[in-house]
């Protein structure tokens, strides 16, 4: 039996060997919404430019940006006596090997694991840690809840977009979103990282929740670290342009964002 999860959809699946194999096994593919980067795209980015890293910035990790990853985690082995485990993340488009830092020591992989560090393997060469928080169930689906690239100047913007995606992916609102706003704290155990909380009222209607989340994402976006056009791109499937313009005008009136001089700027950026 295949251990791969039916996660993701590849428009070029006809040319994808792993996708063809899945089709042969009659395992259906599931379309993941929005602009997803699936595993084959991550691998492709790494292979096309494996030397893209420079200093602390690993350019090909950009394949993770805006990612929704729904994959199956397969346990491979423990690494000596360390709290690290080696595993494989697979979806319908391919697989990558990962090294995961377990939340606590145990003889076996717990039923649920909070993983905080993932080390990507590219053709046997290990690269700098990618930090993430994953909720995973052994041999089951795994959902990316939190993502950042260590020592990357654009880390905060990825957090914000990730929050948007996480919210839109879920059927119900979440009371509290949280992400780090001080990337130095990742590498300084004594630093107190600032956190921004996006408070979502579960009693609100879904549309109102989405509007409120969009408002807060825009508000906590100093110097437009996330291009507004990208933020709106992810909300357009949930909101119409009239609703978007209404909330933008509210933010401008409240001096929470700068006026851009055009109601349609988001479509023209």
Swiss-Prot record:
Record text on subunit structure and interactions: Component of the replication protein A complex (RPA), a heterotrimeric complex composed of RPA1, RPA2/TEB2 and RPA3/TEB3. Component of the telomerase holoenzyme complex, composed of the catalytic core (the catalytic subunit TERT, the telomerase RNA template component TER and TAP65/p65), which is associated with two heterotrimeric subcomplexes: (i) the replication protein A (RPA)-related subcomplex, composed of TEB1, RPA2/TEB2 and RPA3/TEB3 and (ii) the CST-like subcomplex, composed of TAP75/p75, TAP45/p45 and TAP19/p19.
UniProt feature, compositional bias: Polar residues: 1-22
Keywords (A to Z) from UniProt: Chromosome, DNA-binding, Nucleus, Telomere
Native species: Tetrahymena thermophila (strain SB210)
GO cellular component, one term: DNA replication factor A complex
Protein name: Replication protein A 32 kDa subunit
Alphabetized GO MF terms: DNA binding
Name of the gene this protein is made from: RPA2
Family in the record: Belongs to the replication factor A protein 2 family.
Function of the molecule: Component of the heterotrimeric replication protein A (RPA) and holoenzyme telomerase ribonucleoprotein complexes. As part of the RPA complex, binds and stabilizes single-stranded DNA (ssDNA) intermediates, that form during DNA replication or upon DNA stress. It prevents their reannealing and in parallel, recruits and activates different proteins and complexes involved in DNA metabolism. Thereby, it plays an essential role both in DNA replication and the cellular response to DNA damage.
Region (Disordered): 1-25
Residues within the DNA-binding region(s): 69-149
Top-level taxon in the UniProt lineage: Eukaryota
Transcription regulation as UniProt keyword: no
InterPro entries in alphabetical order: NA-bd_OB-fold (IPR012340)
Subcellular location: Nucleus; Chromosome, Telomere
């Amino acid at each position: 039996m295949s251990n791969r999860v039916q996660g993701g959809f590849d428009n070029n699946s006809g040319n994808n060997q792993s996708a063809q194999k899945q089709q042969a096994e009659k395992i259906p593919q599931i379309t993941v919404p929005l602009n997803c980067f699936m595993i084959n795209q991550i691998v492709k980015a790494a292979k096309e430019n494996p030397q893209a890293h420079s200093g602390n910035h690993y350019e090909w990790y950009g394949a993770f940006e805006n990612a929704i990853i729904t994959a199956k985690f397969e346990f491979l082995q423990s690494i000596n006596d360390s709290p690290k485990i080696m595993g494989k993340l697979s979806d319908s488009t391919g697989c990558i090997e990962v090294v995961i830092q377990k939340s606590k020591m145990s003889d076996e992989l717990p039923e649920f694991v909070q993983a905080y560090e993932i080390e990507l393997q590219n053709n046997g060469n290990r690269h700098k840690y990618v930090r993430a928080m994953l909720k995973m169930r052994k041999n089951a689906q795994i959902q990316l809840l939190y993502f950042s690239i260590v020592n990357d100047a654009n880390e905060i913007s990825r957090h914000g977009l990730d929050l948007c995606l996480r919210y839109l992916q879920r059927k119900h609102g979440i009371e509290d979103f949280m992400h780090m706003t001080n990337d130095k704290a990742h590498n300084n155990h004594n630093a107190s990282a600032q956190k921004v909380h996006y408070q979502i009222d579960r009693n609100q209607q879904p549309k109102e929740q989405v509007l409120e989340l969009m408002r807060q994402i825009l508000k906590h976006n100093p110097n437009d670290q996330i291009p507004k056009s990208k933020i709106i791109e992810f909300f357009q499937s949930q909101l119409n342009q009239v609703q978007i313009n209404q909330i933008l005008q509210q933010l401008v009136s409240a001096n929470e964002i700068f006026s851009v001089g055009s109601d349609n700027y988001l479509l023209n950026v």
